[in-house]
Amino acid sequence: MDSLVPQKRSSEDDTPLEVNGFSKKSRDEDVSMHSPVDDETSASEDEDIGVLEYESAAATSNDPKWQKTVENVVKSVVSIHFSQVANFDTESALCSEATGFIVDAKLGIILTNRHVVGPGPFVGYAVFDNHEECEVKPIYRDPVHDFGFLKFNPEDIKYMEVRELALRPDLAKVGCEIRVIGNDSGEKLSILSGFISRLDRNTPDYGPNTYNDFNTEYIQAAASASGGSSGSPVVNCDGYAVALQAGGNSESSTDFFLPVYRVLRALNCVQNNEPITRGTIQVQWMLEPFDKCRRLGLRADSEKAMREKFPALNGLLVSSITLPEGPADGLIKEGDCLLAINGEPISTFIKVDDILDSHIGQEIEIEIQRGGKDMKVKCTVGDLHKITPNRYLSVCGATFNDLSYQLARLYSIPVKGLYVNNASGSFSLNNIVNGWIFDSIDDKDTPDLDTFIEVMKNIPDRAYVTLKYRHLSDLHVPLFKVVCIDRHWNSSFRLATRNDDTGLWDFTDLQDKPLDAPELTPKNAKFIDLPIEFESCKQLDRSFALVHSTIPIPLDSFSGHNRRVYGVVIDAEKGYIFTSRHCVPHDLVDITVTISESIIIPGKVVFLHPTKGYAIVKYDPSLVLAPVQTPQFSDKALERGEKIIFIGYNKNLRVVVDETKVSDIAVINLPTNATSPRFKATNIEAILIDSNLGQQCGSGLLCNKEGQVKAFWLAFDGDEDKVYSMGIDVTDVMWELEFLKNGQLPNLKVIDVEFCSVSILSARITGVPEEWISKIEEKCTDKLQLMSVPKISIKLDNKPSCELKHGDTILSVNDKLITRFRDIDLVIRNLATDVDEVDFKIVRHKQVMNLKVKLSNTSEFTTSQVVYWCGAVLQEPHHGVRQVIKSLPSGVYCTAMTQGSPSRFYTIGVTNFITHVNEQPTPNLNEFLKVIKSIKEKSYCKIRIVSFDNIPFAQTLKVNYHYFPTSELLKDPETKEWKEIEIEAEK
């Protein structure tokens, strides 16, 4: 998770901080230490832990006592490398680094922050002072306060004495000189110095929808710690841990430390094998100064009594939030000043915690002052652990848990409800992954996780159901959506439950298989004529259908997403739709087709053109009773300047119409997505129009006044997230689809290179003879140009796709003069079916040459195998990669990595190639599978990797099959259906 960088505030603590206010010190390490962009290894793997790094003048002083203290303390400090492997509650899956220190050497207990241990699944290891490492498991994370315990086996540390630090919260004093010794900014060991300036600071606010500590004082000092120092011990000159580093202001040198009073109590419970009880009345208190308490109604005599009782006291605890339906609801109100509990005067949060933790299920008497009046209220203390979720559900690609006390407190709502911690798959909601509350699904209320589970068991796969939901940031606005239940791609329907004995989360499958999809019945629908003056064009709306693709798996470098565009029905009798590969990038998708915004039916990908950027989708026409029509297609190509009618669908999927003209027709070379190459359309005669509506619409058509379709209007993916809208002439593609009339799939032949146009001037410079230039000038009636080759693809065997080379200028193909790509297309169109090469006459190095150029079949361009391993999505290098790269290091290409997975933790790297595993070659996916089957659970393997830029490096990776099992997706060559195979590793 990126660091939350706050604005510096000058007001007192009674004002909540900005959302970008403070940063928990390890939060930015997912980017800086295990970045999916940088793919850099951490400094800790490369630098000597024995060389202490002193980062301030005070730390480098020659005080022998401090030097001795530091030498002792560093033996207890460990660097924690960890992954939070799944979204849960307030936390997102991530890989990061932090600090911890040993508090019990005999039992092997490490103290660190709660936001490091996390509320959800945790995997990590600790690196000690001498570079020994051992696995750690979480044994406790506090529901509220920012501390948790990790456990390791002391016997695993063989070459150094395991030392512990004693906790002495009583030694934290204003003015006390301290050292923060930890993993600051990812450095292996940094020593930061400072002086304690406050003991009574309210907890920092890290923002909404994230973990925040509360109901405790924090210690403040200026130590300039940063990311990675979370969990560092704050020690005094005598070597005692007086506090725990927790957070800080990233715009100043201010740091915040957690007092270790309650930490010490929890540690004693663990050491004595006793439960760590945590009580609550669901009230948040704030420490407010006496001047504010007076304004809230505190009487002078009460202030005097409290000051005399506690001379060092500067304020009182004042209620800030009382949760509805909690134990104190209706009894304690905002602004009440706390005086005593069970007759014992209260001056600090520590005493409140002590009383609540020891009175769970018991009634306590709370004395408060409200508006100058003394009041005594009685309420029963609840169990804080019972309102802290320890389970999550995975279904339909999303994950859920019961609403936690943490989030309920942030928004002052009852601690109940179904919370979505990862809204994806069937439940993708506005690209916001968390913060959602589901009120009902399929018209059935879902007040909690258990109810939701029972509801989901009775919903069939592929069923459409209604969803009512809200976002925590705007609970006043109820939202409504129709969702399609996906239990086939996202087949997991299991409950994960925390197991504090093993440190793992145990998975329970809740249903063997979903209910069968509901049977579809034919339906009718009404069309409304287009708002256009030409009668022949009004009914073209009957030739449009909305194509909705759901991409469940990041394949071919396309991340999972949903896309919707309108396609043109090219054969209503057989149910074929012409649409864009922007919407249908590959065939590992779910397709639905919507007719007239009324009928929704499943579709299927039947053809993907490897270069021209279009796809053919098929639906069952027997399910549609509406009068869908096949439009008339023109057999004459468009010309520049020709008047046409543009009918398009904008981003809101509303139809727009404009009379315009063709402004240009040219071969457009789209930019390649540099960060992760993916499919891009090439070698198309792109049609541009003289209308601003063109770039506002991602789908549509161009027609004449007689209603004849002249061109398809499509969206094309470019670099980054840019989308380009252009037309493609029907005469350039309809001949390729003649197979469909006979019920056959197109198996076309293409030249797998990218062509571009060059001017006569450039042609002369490159050596094209004048006689050929004269021929070009004589033939051209629109643009004076020739075709050249800027890029050549390679095949999986690392050979060039054909005999052409970069920079070749094309003169003729099969003795036909070439001035545009359409000329090459026509030559291929007229070839006999058994011909697989054509004759090119080219200019290369200012020499005219004749070449035999081989053609490629379209069947060579689709992906048919995917492997999941340790969170990495691996496949053979797809066509988008082979269009760009010069040489393939391996046939195992990483196209995506899961957050929090070993692949991201150990930085396999997206766009990288795995060439060897444990020194065994992995030239393809099948060989890779053979090798990894021998790697046992929780064991390390060595991986040799080559980057996209051909830079080799080696990496080690520790497998984790419990959270990230190995599986394979295979496409059946006959049925074209995908199936998943689980791969079992050796035990």
Which residues does each predicted region cover?
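Active-site region of chymotrypsin-like
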Residues: 153-165, 190-253, 257, 317-320, ...
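Soluble non-cytosolic domains of exported or imported proteins
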Residues: 60, 64, 169-172, 190, ...
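Conserved active-site neighborhood of the chymotrypsin/trypsin-like protease fold
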Residues: 53-56, 85-87, 93-95, 104-190, ...
